Amino acid sequence: MAKQVKFSEDAPRSMLRGVETLPNAVKVTLGPKGRNVVLEKKFGSPLITNDGVTIPKEIELEDAYENMGAQLVKEVATKTNGIAGDGTTTATVLAAAMIREGLKNVAAGANPMVIRRGMEKAVGAAVEEIKSIAKPVENKSSIAQVAAISADDQEVGNLIAEAMEKVGKDGVITVEESKGFVTELEVVEGMQFDRGYASPYMITDTDKMEAVLNNPFILITDKKISNIQEVLPVLEQVVQSGKPLLIIAEDVEGEALATLVVNKLRGTFTAVAVKAPGFGDRRKAMLQDIAALTGGEVITEELGLDLKSTKLEQLGRAGKIVVTKENTTVVEGAGDKANIESRVAQIRQQIEDTTSDFDREKLQERLAKLAGGVAVIKVGAATETELKEKKLRIEDALNSTRAAVEEGIVPGGGTTLINAIKAVEGVKVEGEEAVGVHIVLRSLEEPVRQIAANAGLEGSVIVERLKKEPVGIGFNAATEEYVNMLEAGIVDAAKVTRSALSNAASVAAMFLTTEAVIADKPEENKAPMGMPDMGGMGGMGMM
């Protein structure tokens, strides 16, 4: 396909229209008085959202050059979301401001490579200032503040804070859609995996349809058990102890399953069989996790262990086990703390080393089950449209909260970026590098200007006032007052603010140093050929 190429001033100018279009759609959502954006869906109801990464994903422009500009800014939002999970709107607004200011200076004859160096120095100083302003998150109320600001909902803030308190920072918190109207929190204590009982005859509580085992022994193996003779020796030892038994195996079937069920129905002893969780190597790792948690051994031929010669000492123990049709929950595992901590450290190292997002997610789940727990926020709403919008907000708030726990909190509402201006002004540069510093200085004001504009106020007046105020004093657009942002609970995660600024500057610098743009030449749609006159057939000629 033929290409068209644009050089020098034409190249960035044609992309600038796309750079402006995308932020214009996103920036209206910024701040407490930000608006929503409606996204068309080919199937189902439209999506109403104020999420700064969902909106850019939907934008594709017809003109190839404009679309390239829009996609560059989209990358800022996506990268910021990937690192910090929030701050996408701020990052988009910052990137557009830097590109706009930068192009003015490049058009006036400034050298883009020198401007870039100045921008990098300025952003470096601003990032260090953000880190120095950051305060660690020390209590539940601070976590609730971060989540409430991100979700624009105090109730959601409290739910996320409660979830984090219960499962710890290593715990997994997931967001699911509820069937009701109320948003609620469900916490699973202990280790839970998604495998249920092998036979419904094993249940002990017919009302709840679950098997509850108190203080049981746990046989853990990666083998398939079909012959009862294989496990008879260990079964006899368990029966003599008078305790119930949980068998976790690749599968329990045939004669072995029938014998367990018959003995349960006769009341001889209680044994529940469940399939091992996961598949392949992940299954082996999860069985080792269960063994560490319960203080047992995985009976596997790889270690030279045989089911027939298994002793009671090799079985795991737990305070309580609840088995439903779909899940098994191990509560109060009797494993040695040092072994569990060693296992946790090993999984943490694997999380750091892996390059696969899928593997990282699965490792994070295993870590949570060993070290923390699992909490589920079930989102309720009156309509499907509201449910989707609410779920997106809660996911953003959750990401922002995790980032806050990691690197601390800073004053919100764009205040920290204004506070960083003094540090940037102190950067020593020569020649045209000063232009790069000026571009960053001007863009640091942009989020506050936009928050004010969305509230129907004049941003310049507020920016000038904030520059004179002490660090931490900001503008609360919801009440239109100047307040101590930390005391008022208007906070952002330091990681979110830092990532937004760094990613915006990175893409802006790349944009400004672009000298040529290549795009596919649009195809001309040829008019469809008309039908020929069908002469010879009386009355059938075309009029």
From Swiss-Prot:
- List the catalysed reactions: ATP + H2O + a folded polypeptide = ADP + phosphate + an unfolded polypeptide
**Localization per record:** Cytoplasm
Key words of the record? ATP-binding, Chaperone, Cytoplasm, Isomerase, Nucleotide-binding
GO annotation terms (biological process): protein refolding
Report any Pfam family annotated for this entry: Cpn60_TCP1
EC primary class: isomerase
Q: Name one GO molecular function term.
A: ATP-dependent protein folding chaperone
Q: Taxonomically, which superkingdom?
A: Bacteria
Fetch the SUPFAM superfamilies from UniProt.
GroEL apical domain-like, GroEL equatorial domain-like, GroEL-intermediate domain like
Question: So what EC number does this one have?
Answer: 5.6.1.7
The positions annotated for binding ATP are 29-32, 86-90, 413, 476-478, 492
Its main localization is cytoplasm
Provide one Gene Ontology cellular component: cytoplasm
Q: Which CDD domains match?
A: GroEL
Protein function: Together with its co-chaperonin GroES, plays an essential role in assisting protein folding. The GroEL-GroES system forms a nano-cage that allows encapsulation of the non-native substrate proteins and provides a physical environment optimized to promote and accelerate protein folding.
Q: Which PANTHER family match?
A: 60 KDA HEAT SHOCK PROTEIN, MITOCHONDRIAL
Give the protein family. Answer: Belongs to the chaperonin (HSP60) family.
The record's subunit annotation is: Forms a cylinder of 14 subunits composed of two heptameric rings stacked back-to-back. Interacts with the co-chaperonin GroES.
Put simply, this protein is called Chaperonin GroEL
Which organism is this entry from? Answer: Brevibacillus choshinensis
Give the gene symbol: groEL
